[in-house]
Design a protein with these regions (language model features):
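Sec-dependent bacterial lipoprotein signal peptides
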Residues: 6-41
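A residue-level marker of the well-folded mature domains of exported/periplasmic proteins
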Residues: 41-345
Length: 345
């Protein structure tokens, strides 16, 4: 940005070539000085325009220029997790001078594919996807590849064999699932039957369930999974599915919800059945509402994700790509656990 203000006439040392200003004075009788003023304005005007449209400074240490546009298709912008992730992206994009075009796929694969096509027509500089259907998103990624637009996935990976993704940024969901399983073992006293409110078409959930089952097998092998319906990660569906599970499994001791909405849906069903405190609920994400439920005792605990960090690191990977660097193919962010003891701190 040009902070020097208006250009001023600079005195010339003796012997310097005659400049435009002096020519104007020498030939004042032949041509009005207005010609000089217009010429000078034209010259300085192009410099000012270039200065005003220059890329915004990047984050500290960034070599990448700003002024880039990134298309982001999020599978469900109503989910608290994705709102936090988007906030992390926006904050980091602002530091780097990037513009984000963020759209909601509304849990619709066809809509998400159309959004990618729209990004391509807009000639965005990079695309970020949180695929609704990991196994069906590949064809859209292929289209972006053909347009030479780099593609990144955040939270949920491309589960198909089609398409090239530069980098996948997500929690270590196997580790997070293992931590959730550890909580469940403690919650049910290392024995009994439990359920999983699943979403099997999503790669990150596949990893969570994998880690959860690994923990049960290692820490509390007497605990058995007796039901694992596809609740789609939605609260109302989880509530309905949990009611059915409770009817069919009178001795159920616990349930693992693969995200906070699933867990909170289970809490509602358990309360309606008069089983609060008898069927333990472990969730995943640890958003504000889930933390409040844990603090009140309605839930036993949660595996923690840090969605804002996922969002920020996604933009960092894109920045490195713009700068000609090669980011890691997989970037894992940390996970943790949150229990009632943590709520009291």
């Amino acid at each position: 940005v040009d902070n020097e203000g208006p250009r001023s006439t600079i005195a010339k040392p003796k012997g310097a070539p005659i400049g435009l200003e002096e020519n104007c004075l020498n030939y004042a009788r032949l041509a009005p000085c207005l010609a000089f003023a217009l010429a000078l304005a034209a010259c300085s005007g192009s410099s000012t325009d270039a200065s005003n449209t220059a890329a915004s400074p990047g984050a500290a240490g960034s070599a990448a220029p700003g002024g880039k546009t990134i298309g982001v298709s999020i599978q469900d912008r109503e989910a608290q997790f994705y709102q936090d992730m988007e906030a992390g992206m926006q904050a980091e994009a602002k530091k780097n001078g990037y513009t984000l075009i963020v759209v909601d796929a509304n849990r619709d694969n066809a809509k998400q594919q159309s959004q990618v096509e729209d990004f391509i027509s807009k000639k965005v500089d990079a695309i970020v996807l949180t695929p609704f259907d990991s196994n069906a998103i590949g064809s859209a990624i292929v289209e972006a590849n053909s347009a030479n637009i780099p593609v990144f996935t955040a939270d949920i990976a491309n589960g198909s064999s089609q398409g090239k993704v530069v980098s996948h940024i997500a929690s270590d969901n196997v580790q997070g699932g293992y931590q959730a399983g550890t909580l469940m073992c403690a919650a049910v006293g290392n024995s009994g039957s439990v359920a999983i409110l699943d979403q099997p078409e999503v790669t990150s959930v596949q990893d969570r369930v994998k880690g959860f089952k690994q923990a049960l097998a290692k820490i509390c092998p007497a605990v058995k999974v007796v039901a694992d319906p596809d609740s789609g990660g939605k609260r109302d569906k989880a509530n309905s599915d949990m009611g059915d599970i409770l009817q069919a499994n009178k001795d159920l001791k616990g349930v693992f919800g693969i995200n906070d909405d699933s867990a909170l849906g289970a809490v509602t069903a358990i309360k309606a059945a008069g089983l609060s405190g008898k069927v333990m609920v472990v969730g995943y994400d640890a958003g504000p509402e889930a933390r409040a439920a844990i603090a009140s005792g309605a839930m036993y605990g949660d595996a923690i994700q840090y969605p804002a960090q996922i969002g920020a690191q996604t933009i960092d990977a894109i920045r490195d790509t713009f700068a000609g660097k090669t980011p890691p193919a997989k970037i894992a962010t940390k996970t943790g656990t949150f229990t009632q003891a943590d709520a009291k701190k």
